[in-house]
Structure formats: structure tokens, C-alpha cells
Amino acid sequence: MEYESVRLFIERAIQANSQFTLTSENAPSVAQICERLDGIPLAIELAAARVKLFTPQQIAERLGDRLKLLTGGSRTALPRQQTLRALIDWSYLTLNETEQSVLCRLAVFSGGWTFEAAEAVAGEMEVMDGLSGLVNKSMVHVEEQEGQSRYRYLETIRQYAMEKLLESGDAIDARDRHLAHFLDLSRRAERHFRTPQRLAWMNQLEAEHDNIRAALSWALESDPESALRMVVLLSLFWQSHNYLTEGCNWCQSAISRAEGSSLDRDKIDPTRAQAYTALAMLSVNRGDHQSGQTAARKSVAIARRIDDKLTLVRALNSLGFTSAFLGDITLAFDSLHESEDICRKVGYREELAEVLQALVYVTMEVHGSQAAEQLQAYMQESLALSQRSVDPEAAVRTEGLLARLAFFQGDLAEARKHADLMLDRHREMGDQLAVTDHQSMMAHSARQLGNFEEALALYRETIQEWQEIGHRGAVAHQLECFAFIARAKEEGERAAKLMSAAEALREASSSPRTPQERIEYDTELDSLRAGMDEKAFTSLWAEGHSMNMEQAIEYALTENTS
């Protein structure tokens, strides 16, 4: 199908412009045109005719409004140009009134929809009759996905239906219904994030992510309170599915829109505090600790003022985490211990397990194995609480801390055992961020055991995953790990460049090392400099420091053939 579409485009393009040829430069654009026009021969012919005026790249860029591009944007265009619109107009006129109404209202969906969603937007009785008619008349396509029917438009039909919806005056009502449905879906999903049904609900949100984006966009325009609620409900989904930057952007937009609106501040403050906590959590996980700390401070301030203990606990946890990464150790422990005290006084058992796990993590990063007795106490209580929890992730988080604790204590084989088990569980739960994090820990264990090839294979995966996530601090640490291996393999020049590139990235992104990372880095750097001429080292350091992140990653991934 794809090959035939491209062949048709080339034939019609040559008819329109005899100088047209398919090249390596325009081939991706031609393929994109055919894909975005859903392989419809008539649409492809009309697009190819535009090579008289535009390059394939320009045509692809203008496909955002297919009907306007392909018909010249006018109902008085030449008959040949009007063919596509005439075809869709004719199909539309064959529909009865109910089918026409349903066709228009379903244009608010992005990326398809379920029958339940269609009922919410177009009405139960109308959808029952109208949708089946649209399917029978090939205006709507239906697919089976995991035992459920999912419906979609060809994009040209969706744009036509949206035009009709806007003309009808029903667009606002349809979008409001669409928003209400996906706000409700987000609410129902969030209730199951800490249950064994977590993966099924996460997968459902993934399938509806385009619709969620559309609903959020409309909420920002018309209903800022709903936008604020949605970002709170979706924050864990964005975190586990590696939509960290996107999630941060939605949170910032929702908070800004709500704070700039005429909404009653007392009414929205509880949700606003939760939104700041969500922003802090997402920022921390993408390595933007400064933004994370700022958001966490705001959440703490609001939660204290309105006396919302549960939100305060979660905000303090975020403040503790991000402050530890920024080197503000006193604030980190003060925040986490205050959270611990509240949990014990109020009886927040699930949250107590989480703050104890946070204390284990931060204590390890700051004090390493020197605080073994305190770490053991935190771990034992956290493990006992996790075993009584209905949240499947609680046990997995504990397993992860056992792996990290074994790693810091130098028991690398034990660390690997726990990491392997935890990695499998995170994959089962669909938590992609946690998978990347623990693959990194497995790489660290392999490196420290001297299994350099295994470690390098893992680092080659994880450094690109951290880059995609946008966690510049994690990328910098991975570059350092590549450098440590290079030094161990007596590739001093390579090690110097990589360590310098990592240093430059940390400086540019305000991503300091944790105390434990600093100890290893300083030891490696001292050993490297001791075995190298100072003038040569200075030259190599300057070369590495001039690399941007993309260049440094490319250099790290390139095999040393010298």
C-alpha cells in the first residue's frame, strides 16, 4: 500500500512538473505526504499536482489543513481541484440527520475513540444508530484492539467533519463533553494507580493520550479548574511513561492559567498545591532540581496555609528529594523528618512507607554505608509497611532500595540479584522511567565488578533513554561512567574528554553530583591526571569541554578503534 501510494505520487508529480525527480532529500517528505493522506489515491493525486508550486517538503509542512491545500481553499476552485471536497460532500449528503450530527460531533476526538467515549460526546441514542451508519458507509473505520472496538476517521474526513461542527454552532458543547469524559477517565484511572489494575489503566491512558492532550488544550482555554485537576490526576502516568517534559509543561500551563483566572483562590488552593507537587515530582525525575525545589516550596507553603496534611506530606517528600540533589542536605533531612512526623501522628501508613524509602535513598546518597545502622532501621520498617500495602509498586520500590543498599555496601552480586528482580517487575507494571533507572544501576554494578562489555552495552541504551527523557544530570553521570571504563581500559585521552564533557554539561544544567558520586569522580579524576602529562591533559580537557550534549553522547557511543 505504501509503495503504491509513493509510486502514484511520483507519476502524478512528473505529469505536473516534468523536472520532478525522487531524491534522497525529498523521499522522506513524499513518504510523509502519502502516510498523512491515509493512502487515498485521489488525495495523493491532488497533492502531487501541487509540485508545480511547492517542493514535497513544503507540501508536507502544509498538510495541517489538507482540504485547504488540496482544493485551493475555495469552493469555487477548478473542478479538478474540487473533486476531493465534492466526493466528501456527496458522502455527507447521503447521511441521514442523525448520522450527520454524530459525524460532526466525533470530530473533537484525536487518535480515535471508544463507543463509550462517543456516547459521552454525541449522546447514547444518537450514537447507537448514527455510528453504525457511519461505519457501514465507510465514513468511520473500526478496529479491534484487545477485545474492544476502537473507531477512527481518516484525517481528511475528520477535518471536513470539524468544519461542519464549527458551522453548526455545537463545537463548544461537543468539546465540553469531550473534556468531561476524559477528566472522568483520568479520575477513574488515578484511583487504580496503586492497585493491581494499574497496568491496565495506564495502558488505557496511553491509548487515549492524544484525546487527553486535546481535552487539556480545551480546558486551558475554557475551564482552568478542570485543567488543574487533570494535571494532578495524570502526573503519575506522565512520570511512569517518560512524558516528563510534556507533563511539566502541562502542569506549568495549568497552574499559570488558574492563577491568572478569576477562580476563587480558596476553592482551588488544595488542587493548586497538588499541582505544584506534581510539577516538583516531574521536574525532579527529569533532573531539573532547581525547578523541582521551587515548585515543592510553593506546594509546602500553600499546604501549610490551608492545613492540608496529606498534600503537605507529599510536598515535603518532593522538597526533601530535590534539596538533596541540590546539595542542601540540612533542608533535605528537615523536610523528610517533618513528613515522617506528620505520617506517624496522623496515621498515614502508605505515605510513611514512602518517606522512609526516601530517607533510605537520601541517606545512602549522602552518607553511603557509614550510616548502616540507621539505614537498616529505615529499611526494616519500610519493608514491613510495604508488605501490608495493596499497592504493588510499594514492594517493588523496596526491592529497588535493597538493590541500591547492597550496591552502596559493596555487595554487587546481591545488588544485581535485587535489580534483576525489580527490573522484571517494573517492566510488568509498564513503568518505563523506573526501568531506565534500574538498568543504569545494573550497568553500574557490572562496571564495578569489572564486566566492562556488559556495562557498556547497558550504558549505550540508558544514556540515550536519559537523553530522551531530558535528564541532563543523568546523562552527565553516564558520560562519567563511560570515562571510568575508558580509564580502566587505559584509554586516557578518551576518559579525559568524556569527564570534561560531563563537567561542562553539569555546569550548564546546574546538576551537581551527589556526595557518593563526587567521591568516585574525584578518585577517578585524580588517577587519570596522575598518569598523564599535565599539558596534554589540559588540551584534552578543553576539547571535551567544548562538546555539547549531543556531541558528547555521540563520542561516548563511538567505539574506540585506536
Language model segments and positions:
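Tetratricopeptide repeat
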Residues: 215, 247, 251-254, 292, ...
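Acidic, proline/glycine-rich low-complexity intrinsically disordered segments
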Residues: 18, 134, 145, 154, ...
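Tandem amphipathic alpha-helical repeat scaffolds
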Residues: 228-242, 271-288, 311-328, 351-371, ...
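Eukaryotic all-alpha helical interaction scaffolds
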Residues: 219, 238, 258, 283, ...
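Short coil/turn linkers that connect adjacent helices within long alpha-helical scaffolds
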Residues: 221-222, 261-267, 301-308, 341-348, ...
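Aliphatic-rich helical/repeat scaffold segments used for oligomerization and domain docking
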Residues: 1-257, 472-473, 479-481, 485-501, ...
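Alpha-helical protein-protein interaction modules
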Residues: 426-562
